């Protein structure tokens, strides 16, 4: 901006001065003192002494032009250095009148546009590589550096440890898997190995031990699951073999092995005296005739205490007999079956109630009935025949 010089006491000064005919004297923005000089400089509505208006950076006294940013006043060069476009190499401002070089979005001074390795200034047409930090490298130096890096990253030779050194390290590891620094220094001096080599050896050894323990645990669990699978397979094969075995196999379940009714002791007196001599409960085997009974008459009323309504050993009654029998009529409680028994008399016999009749003869079956033609079949010879030979159609 152009500086405005006002002469004190003149008519022009009276027109331009913001304090015409004012008793107050303006203060200088630089030294904060009253301005009583002949000339007053005015910049952005602020008054300055001629000697106080200077560049904030180079302290050059400004006479014709100045540049302002914030509260500072600058000359042209310093203003563009501070607030203008900066060089990507030296981070200094570039004046608008200076010739520059550009690489992508970066701007360089002419003397800053050079290789950082050989310091050679790059000219128009030269090939170069732009690094990530905006630095420049010529093609020759870049290829050389890349080749050296490839050679340096080649596989280094492995460190060889002798048997004696290995024994010393193993003994130290057995004492302490993670030794302190002074112990490693002592081992390094004893074995002649580098401190770094000793430290890496202990690290590798600890990692190896940890890996071996982990593998051992996996093997134990694997063996456990294999044994479980093998045992399950064996039990399954045993079941299959039992199903495939014939009737003579040990796995067959036979009812003939069970104890006979004569060997079973029940609280009820009905089955207490059954004998093997009468295979069909008193009748001859192979016939459907009557059966023999040995008794001394009809038992008294007090002999039926073993038979109750909820007793599991009571003689079942046919549905037809429920109506004909008197209420709570006692049944036969104790039966004795000797080898040669006496037959019970037929219908109308003395001593036998009319409501209960025991039919004897060559009829189709023995029956306990009240005149009904349909009754229960004879008791079979053995428990096995109860399950196999009973005709359920009769029920």
Swiss-Prot record:
The record ties this protein, via Pfam families, to: Homeodomain, LIM
Q: Where is the composition biased (Polar residues)?
A: 257-276
- An example of a Gene Ontology BP annotation on this entry? negative regulation of apoptotic process
Question: Where found?
Answer: Nucleus
Give the signal sequence positions. Answer: none
Listed Gene3D superfamilies: Cysteine Rich Protein, Homeodomain-like
Q: Say if the entry is tagged with keyword Transferase.
A: no
Annotated region (Disordered), positions in chain: 209-325, 348-395
**DNA-binding interval(s):** 154-213
Major location (coarse): nucleus
Q: Which InterPro entries match?
A: HD, Homeobox_CS, Homeodomain-like_sf, Lhx3/4-like_LIM2, Lhx3_LIM1, LIM_Homeobox_TF, Znf_LIM
The LIM zinc-binding domain sits at: 28-78, 87-141
Read off the CDD domains from this record: homeodomain (cd00086), LIM1_Lhx3b (cd09467), LIM2_Lhx3_Lhx4 (cd09376)
Keyword field contains Transcription = yes
Q: What UniProt keywords apply to this chain's record, in alphabetical order?
A: Activator, DNA-binding, Homeobox, LIM domain, Metal-binding, Nucleus, Repeat, Transcription, Transcription regulation, Zinc
Record GO terms (molecular function): DNA-binding transcription activator activity, RNA polymerase II-specific; DNA-binding transcription factor activity, RNA polymerase II-specific; RNA polymerase II cis-regulatory region sequence-specific DNA binding; RNA polymerase II transcription regulatory region sequence-specific DNA binding; RNA polymerase II-specific DNA-binding transcription factor binding; transcription coactivator binding; zinc ion binding
Highest taxon of the source?
A: Eukaryota
Q: Which GO terms describe its cellular component?
A: chromatin; nucleus; transcription regulator complex
The UniProt function text for this chain reads: Transcription factor. Defines subclasses of motoneurons that segregate into columns in the spinal cord and select distinct axon pathways. Acts in conjunction with LIM-1, ISL-1 and ISL-2.
- Tell me the protein's name: LIM/homeobox protein Lhx3
